[in-house]
Curated annotation (Swiss-Prot):
It comes from the Bacteria. The gene is rplA. The lineage of its organism: Bacteria, Bacillati, Actinomycetota, Actinomycetes, Kitasatosporales. SUPFAM superfamilies: Ribosomal protein L1. Transmembrane segments: none annotated. Binds directly to 23S rRNA. The L1 stalk is quite mobile in the ribosome, and is involved in E site tRNA release. This is Large ribosomal subunit protein uL1.
Amino acid sequence: MKRSKTLRAADAKVDREKLYAPLEAVRLAKETSTTKFDGTVEVAFRLGVDPRKADQMVRGTVNLPHGTGKTARVLVFATGDRAAAAEAAGADIVGDDELINEIAKGNRLNEFDAVVATPDLMGKVGRLGRVLGPRGLMPNPKTGTVTMDVAKAVTEIKGGKIEFRVDKHSNLHFIIGKVSFTDEQLVENYGAALDEILRLKPSAAKGRYIKKAALSTTMGPGIHLDSNRTRNLLVEEDPAAV
């Protein structure tokens, strides 16, 4: 009962009818965080696209200026010098045929958060689509995870590069940091992600592109964001409205 009272108290602080400016939303999210551990801060978008149509798929990557607060575990499919370069860059798991067979059997799937592969191995890695695809982990040239420069890819992912892809319900969601981050760090991470989502707007998408946006912490209430705010994100009031 104590836990539910805490959650209700946090929920009561959020105005469900209001669209919050990013800075205001971040402050409120941190205030209403109910976990004893350092919770994550996540953003979710509902986009005005039909992901069933190839020309309306929204998929990309963004380098968050302050990272996510979590160091991603990276698996790399590579051989020879490329495998050595991946290991030197800090890859957590590196291998080729034997590792591909392990993953195909569904083993070790909880040991990594991102996958990189060299182009020459994609013929073999391709058969992992039914295992890695649903988890959003399939290497893709468009996101820089199919590359000969595996060291660079590993370094970027470890440094806070995140990959996003709209789901079948037209939603996008990803972590922008931890509750322990400063307000400015969280807003700047949000701004970097928002800029990239706007840049990737499909020309075939009609009507309003970002229909809804919300920010929340682990076990915290959802806070609706004013998705029209794309500039002056570190200002609590919208200068255009003053």
